[in-house]
Amino acid sequence: MSDGEEDQTAIVCDNGSGLVKSGFAGDDAPRAVFPSTVGRPRHQGVMVGMGQKDSYVGDEAQSKRGILTLKYPIEHGIITNWDDMEKIWHHTFYNELRVAPEEHPTLLTEAPLNPKANREKMTQIMFETFNVPAMYVAIQAVLSLYASGRTTGIVLDSGDGVSHNVPIYEGYALPHAIARLDLAGRDLTDYLMKILTERGYSFVTTAEREIVRDIKEKLCYVALDFEQEMATAASSTSLEKSYELPDGQVITIGNERFRCPETLFQPSFIGMESAGIHETTYNSIMKCDIDIRKDLYANNVLSGGSTMYPGIADRMQKEITALAPSTMKIKIIAPPERKYSVWIGGSILASLSTFQQMWITKQEYDEAGPSIVHRKCF
């Protein structure tokens, strides 16, 4: 690092499918958290001099969502629209953090088992468009484990676009046992939109989907026993809650509150053939060496926004206990700040002195090209 230690602070940017979390290494929380959306007007502007733009990013897109079509450039953890992604990064550096990217090493995050081209293109844009001096791409779940202060454990990271299980032993990720499930928060929002329609509330536009996401975040929970909860909901109104829509209309939601996140445990609800998150966790542990399974069972770390439902830790405990050997000690770790634990782990990693030789420098990139990212990043 140069003399200007302060100027060279690394930037940590966890670009999730739903939210971008960004800030400076060494901080204990991200400075900027905003939706990874780009909105474009769906109407013709008529007021001259309003300074209307052809696109809006993040919170501004959210606040004007009534007149915009919102698009998320990251789907299931994979960047599908690079032009919009560039807008989001530009917004992150210049508007949210107010820094010049050419002065700061930048740590980005990625879901495991992503297409290789995805991280190559990320590397290319960082060096060629934003001229960063150095960068690194880290696996999200590994960072969550850092944040929990462990070196061994199995992380279930579930965000808006993708859920994955990554077993890590003494700091080494075990790639053969990584499980990825393309079922996460956005699918739950879509499912909630669908089951609310059955109740007679229609939500269709991209803006209305954001309202449903808010309902999901405020009112949904995971039932400990799904069948029993369904029976309770059918026989009484004790589980019903009301929600006021932006136009003042009040809607009531009952068993939808737990039917929505139940999809994580029963993906067949949305027509997916996959096993639920409890089973993928168990299968992932079973793919690991018999000697380390005990340590993994005792360190089940939850991370990401879709693990924030009340009741999810107890339910995981119950489901994994049912699958595991009867004498096994099973512990689910659900840190309160798990929504941001990927970012926090990145902040810890990027400020370690031992990490400084891991950065991909501009010079290395110029010599080897984008494929350098596979050699230097796990």
Curated annotation (Swiss-Prot):
Q: Does the keyword Hydrolase apply?
A: yes
Q: Which InterPro entries match?
A: Actin, Actin/actin-like_CS, Actin_CS, ATPase_NBD
Q: Which Pfam families match?
A: Actin (PF00022)
Q: State the UniProt keywords alphabetically.
A: ATP-binding, Cytoplasm, Cytoskeleton, Hydrolase, Muscle protein, Nucleotide-binding
Name of the top EC class for this enzyme: hydrolase
- Which PROSITE patterns does the annotation name? ACTINS_1, ACTINS_2, ACTINS_ACT_LIKE
Reactions that this protein is recorded to catalyse: ATP + H2O = ADP + phosphate + H(+)
Q: Where in the cell is it found?
A: Cytoplasm, Cytoskeleton
**What cellular component GO annotations does this protein have?**
cytoplasm; cytoskeleton
Give the E.C. number(s): 3.6.4.-
Question: GO molecular function of the protein, one example?
Answer: hydrolase activity
Q: Does the keyword Hydrolase apply?
A: yes
Predominantly, its location class is cytoplasm
* Family membership: Belongs to the actin family.
Protein role: Actins are highly conserved proteins that are involved in various types of cell motility and are ubiquitously expressed in all eukaryotic cells. Multiple isoforms are involved in various cellular functions such as cytoskeleton structure, cell mobility, chromosome movement and muscle contraction.
Name the UniProt record assigns to this protein: Actin, muscle 1A
User: Which species expresses this protein natively?
Assistant: Halocynthia roretzi
